[in-house]
Swiss-Prot record:
Keywords: ATP-binding, Nucleotide-binding, Transport
Protein name: Uncharacterized ABC transporter ATP-binding protein MJ0412
GO MF entries: ATP binding; ATP hydrolysis activity
Entry-linked PROSITE patterns: ABC_TRANSPORTER_1, ABC_TRANSPORTER_2
SMART domains from the UniProt entry: AAA
């Protein structure tokens, strides 16, 4: 039987990140809690993939394992075919909490990773200024984090991550603490940067609207222990209209997939 066009297209795509048979068990006071159960997932090069699910389903745990900040109990993560065994410059992480160094200016926050790599001063300043401009903060190079709004601080965090030129960008609910208007603006800016820089993005969110707006595919996890319940391909052209019938249909579909899992997580 001949493969359909979608499967053929997927076969031609390069797998950037592969999660194989991944299980994570935490131990608390002698009790074992299974957070993730037998996760198998492929993320393609230049793909924008989002993971979502009810609270406590293991979304952030999965991201931390991919980042090398935590370790699986069973299974493994492969990036470009190499097993992840700890943090590395090939993965950039943007967290929900603002993680800028308060004693460093915007420019020096963005150049920090480049300094660790030993890149010459003039070159790292040039690279940093490029990404500061890209996130719309040109003119704020000498500002300190306390002088910036939450949205501006997250822009700096994104610039800092991209300046290090990682193979994959991991984003753990980076816009969750922002007001709706700022969140929408940063979503649009993130998409522009993603399309320009052609990075692979692994994004975690609680927001169905955000997932449909940003993603090529949305991975929905079950209530704990997190398993992949369904992967939804978002077949909408960009820029996307949040009020279109097609957009709302995807939103409804994912909400329906999530409904039972959210109820389970509350029991």
């Amino acid at each position: 039987m001949e493969k359909d066009d979608e499967v053929k297209k997927r076969d031609r795509m390069k797998v950037k990140l592969k999660v194989e048979n991944l299980t994570k068990i935490f131990e608390f006071n002698g009790n074992r809690v299974k957070a993730l159960d037998n996760i198998n997932l492929e993320v393609y090069e230049n793909e924008f993939l989002t993971v979502m699910g009810p609270s406590g389903c293991g979304k952030t745990t999965l991201l931390r394992i991919i980042a090398g900040l935590d370790y699986p109990t069973e299974g493994k993560v492969l990036l470009d075919g190499k097993e992840v065994k700890g943090p590395g410059a090939d993965r950039g992480v943007v967290f929900q909490q603002y993680t800028l160094m308060p004693w460093r200016t915007v420019l020096k926050n963005v150049t920090f990773g480049l300094e660790l790599k030993g890149i010459p001063k003039n070159e790292r300043i040039e690279i940093a200024k490029k990404f500061i401009k890209m996130v719309g903060l040109e003119g704020f190079e000498d500002a300190y984090p306390y002088q910036l709004s939450g949205g501006m601080q997250q822009r700096v965090a994104i610039a800092r991550t991209l300046a290090n030129d990682p193979e994959i960008v991991l984003m753990d609910e980076p816009f969750a603490a922002l007001d709706a208007q700022t969140r929408n603006i940063l979503q649009n800016e993130l998409l522009k940067i993603w399309q320009k820089e052609k990075k692979t993005v692994f994004f975690v969110t609680h927001s169905v609207d955000e997932a449909v707006y940003l993603s090529d595919r949305v991975v929905v996890l079950t209530a704990r222990p997190g398993r992949i319940k369904e992967i939804v391909k978002i077949d909408l052209e960009r820029p996307r209209d949040r009020t279109s019938i097609e957009f709302l249909e995807y939103r409804k579909k994912i909400l329906n997939i999530l409904k039972d899992e959210v109820l389970k997580s509350l029991k």
